Amino acid sequence: MAEYTHYFIQYNLTDIFYEDVNIEKYSCSICYESVYKKEIYQCKEIHWFCKTCWAESLFKKKECMICRCIVKSISELSRNRFIEQDFLNIKVNCPNSFKYIDENKNNNNKIKDLENGCKDIITIGEIEKHLKQCKFTHIKCKFIGCNKIIRLNQVEKHEKEQCEFRLEYCRYCDTDGITSRSLENHYKECPKFIVKCSENGCTVQLERSQLESHIEKQCQMVMIDCPYKIYGCEQSNRFPKSNLTQHLSSINHTLAMGSMIESQSLQIKETNIKYENLLNKINKLEQLETESKCDQLYDKFYQFESKIDKKLNNLQLDLYPKDNQQPQQKEQKEQKEQKEQQERIKFDDLFEKVSKVNSYFINGCLLKYKNRWSISNYLTESRKYRKITSPSFKIYDKKFKLVIYPQGKDDGSYTSLFLKSDSINPIKVFYKFVLLNFKDESKNLIFKNKSIMDKEKSVGCHYFIKSTEPGKKPEVWLKDDSLVIDFSIEVNINNDIKPLES
C-alpha cells in the first residue's frame, strides 16, 4: 500500500460526545482537567483527585486537600477505577464524522459531514483503536502536484478517475508517466496517434508521423497542378491527384512536353557550365595554396643560407688575421680558439635547421601522409580473394591505394604488398610499410624504399612476409583476426620527371 500523509482532525472530547454529558462530574476538582488518560486516587473519605495533583499537594502537606485527613504518601491512597472506567464508557462520535476544512487548520469550527463522514458510535476508550483502522480518516493524494485532502475510502476512485495529476499511459506511443491533465495535449502531438488524412475526401486513417509522407506521395485526394502547366497546359485549375491519368489522356500535351524537354536540356547545360567553372576555381585555389606554401619554405631556406654565409665570413676573418697584425699572446690565442668553438656550435645548429627546411624540397614540394590499414577477418579474406585492396586516399590531387596479395603476386610462398596510383604522370615517392608485431613491437616487419611510379603505377615489395606466417602465428601478426599495417608516404608533387626514351 502506498505511503500517505495523514491529516487528523483536532478535537476536544466535548466536541464528539454523542449525548449531553456533565463533564464536571469527570474532572479533577483541583486542575479541572478531565480524567481521560489519568490515574484517579481517593482518600478514605472518598475524596478523589488526579495522581498529579495528589503528588503536588502531598509534597507540601501530608493531608487530604478537602477533609484534611492524614495522608503520608500516595501508597496510602486507593485507586478509583470506577470513575476512570465510567468515563471511558461514555459514547462519542468518531472524530472523522466531521469535515476536514483545509482553510481552518485547527478545525475550530466543526462541521458534520452527514454524507461522507464516519457514522460509527464508539466509546471514549475505543477512540485510539478505532482511528487506526477508520476508513474515513483524511489523507493527502499521493500524486505530485495534487494537494487535495480526501478520505481513505475515497482514495481509489480519486486516484483512478478524478485526480488530474494521476499518471497515465499513452497506448499509441508506449510513453508512460504522463499526467491526466496533460494527456489530451499529448494526443495532439503524439507521433503515433491515429489521425484522419487532412485532405478533403480522403478517408485514410494513419499515424500522425506518416501523415506528411502520405499526403506527399500516396494521397489521391490531394489537389495538384498539371505537371505541364508551366509549359503551356490548357488546364489552369487544380484537381485531385486521382484525376491525373484522366486529365493526361483527355488533353494533348505534346507541345508542352517538347517545351519541357527543351527547358530541362538548357538547365542541364547551364548546370554543367557552372560545375566546370567551379572545378576550375577549386583547382586554381589549390595550386595557389601549394605555390604559396612552397614560396614560404623557399624564403626560410634562403634566410638560413644567408645567415650561414655571414657566419662563415665572420669565422674566416677571425681565424685568418691580416698579415700586418702582430702575433697574439698565448691567452688571446686561447680565447680565439674558444670563440671559434662556440661559432662552430652555432654553425652546426643553423646547418641542421637548413637541412630540415631543405628536406621539403626535392625538385618541388614534398607532401607527407601517414595512416594505418587494418584488414578485418584477414585469414578468411586471404583464402577467399587473390588480392585485398584498401580504401583509396588522396595526397594533393593524386589518388592512391594499397593492395596486398596474401598468396603473392608472383610467388605463392610470400605475401606481396604494393602502393598504387591513378596518376597519368610519373611520381617520385618515398614510402614505408610497417607490419605490426603484437608480441614484440621491436620486431615489427619494416620495408621502406623510394621509387618513381611511371607506367607501372605501382611500387612495393614482392616478398613482404611468408604467406603462411599469419596463420601459423596469429597471436603475433593478428589482433582480433585483423592484420594491421602502418604506412607513410612522401610525394613530390612538383617534379618534372619524364621517362627515358631511346
Curated annotation (Swiss-Prot):
GO MF, one example: nucleic acid binding
Induction: Down-regulated by Pseudomonas aeruginosa, PAO1 strain and up-regulated by PA14 strain infection.
Coiled-coil spans in chain: 261-295
This protein's GO CC annotations: cytoplasm
SUPFAM superfamilies: RING/U-box (SSF57850), TRAF domain-like (SSF49599)
Main localization, broad class: cytoplasm
Keyword annotations from UniProtKB, A to Z: Coiled coil, Cytoplasm, Metal-binding, Repeat, Zinc, Zinc-finger
Keyword check for Repressor: no
InterPro entries given in the database record: DNA-dir_DNA_pol_B_CS, MATH/TRAF_dom, TRAF-like, Znf_RING/FYVE/PHD, Znf_TRAF
UniProt KW Ribonucleoprotein keyword: no
Compartment(s): Cytoplasm
MATH domain mapped to chain residues: 368-489
Zinc finger (RING-type): 28-68
ZnF TRAF-type span: 129-183, 185-243
Pfam families per UniProt: MATH_2 (PF22486), zf-TRAF (PF02176)
PANTHER family per the UniProt record, alphabetical: RING FINGER PROTEIN DG17-RELATED (PTHR10131:SF65), TNF RECEPTOR ASSOCIATED FACTOR (PTHR10131)
Annotated function: Probable adapter protein and signal transducer that links members of the tumor necrosis factor receptor family to different signaling pathways by association with the receptor cytoplasmic domain and kinases.
UniProt record similarity statement: Belongs to the TNF receptor-associated factor family. A subfamily.
Free-text comment about domains: The MATH/TRAF domain binds to receptor cytoplasmic domains.
Protein name: TNF receptor-associated factor family protein DDB_G0268444
Organism: Dictyostelium discoideum (Social amoeba)
